[in-house]
């Protein structure tokens, strides 16, 4: 079973191929940095312009055609509003054209799944800007990764307090939110916080594809019409409209 995973929820977009739970190929594109000259995905400014070349690049790397895929997996958020819409629209288009099933995966869950060699609590933090993070706590025991808190957007201070409430004195935290607020996390836990880059999967797309595998194996998938992004908070445009009305 070959799954194509796609993530554009963060500044680093990624696509990956996972076969029977094992990573076959992956490609990453960080829009905050210039693409390397030898990269098949050239710097084009935004996810809308690079997502299709990114998918084609990972298919080429894995020597896989769309017709050979068993399904598509996509991160549904939280994350960049525009990025989430682009990924979902792209995946739905491919699914309709090729008759492929689709599974949506929480970006925070995929982020936590990038850590395998750790038993216990994992704090998944994605940078939501404005001194806020998208945040959830997970617990890994063996091969099982279980959410133990709701997914939410909150201040970094609130996330730190939640980790403390979970009884963690040296929490393992992962994600660009953990990196962005590393000094605060280090101070809060006396330098004992473990900032992890991920030891199992280098990209969110690979983790997304791997997490979807069980559902595909059970012949389960999401309804395309009802599959929508998980934003967790209102957009700037919605906030401005609400302020104008009030």
Q: PLM features: what roles do these ranges have?
A:
Residues 194-246:
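Acyltransferase
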Residues 60, 64, 143, 165, ...:
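Generic secondary-structure signature for well-ordered alpha-helical cores
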Residues 60-68, 95-105, 220:
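Phosphate-handling active-site elements
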Residues 58-62, 97, 115, 208-216:
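Stable alpha-helical structural segments in soluble proteins, enriched in small hydrophobic residues
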Residues 1-76:
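N-terminal beta-alpha supersecondary unit
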């Amino acid at each position: 079973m070959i799954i194509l995973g796609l993530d554009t929820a963060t500044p680093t977009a990624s696509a990956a191929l996972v076969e029977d739970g094992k990573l076959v190929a992956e490609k990453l594109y960080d829009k905050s940095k210039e693409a390397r000259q030898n990269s098949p995905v050239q710097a084009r400014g935004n996810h809308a312009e690079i997502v299709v070349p990114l998918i084609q690049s990972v298919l080429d790397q894995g020597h896989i055609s769309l017709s050979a895929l068993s399904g598509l997996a996509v991160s549904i958020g939280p994350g960049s509003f525009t990025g989430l819409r682009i990924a979902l629209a792209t995946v739905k288009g491919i699914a309709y054209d090729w008759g492929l099933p689709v599974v949506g995966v929480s970006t925070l869950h995929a982020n936590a799944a990038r850590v395998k060699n750790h038993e216990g609590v994992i704090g998944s933090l994605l940078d939501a800007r404005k001194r806020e993070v998208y945040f959830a706590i997970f617990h890994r025991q063996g091969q099982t990764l279980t959410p133990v808190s709701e997914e939410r957007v909150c201040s970094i201070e609130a996330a730190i307090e939640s980790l403390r409430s979970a009884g963690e004195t040296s929490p393992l935290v992962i994600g660009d939110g953990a990196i962005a607020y590393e000094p605060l996390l280090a101070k809060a836990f006396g330098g004992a916080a473990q900032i992890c880059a991920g030891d199992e999967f280098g990209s969110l797309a690979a983790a997304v594809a791997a997490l979807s595998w069980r559902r595909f194996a059970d012949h389960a998938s999401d309804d395309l019409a009802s599959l929508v992004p998980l934003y967790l908070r209102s957009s700037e445009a919605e906030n401005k409209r609400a302020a104008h009305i009030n």
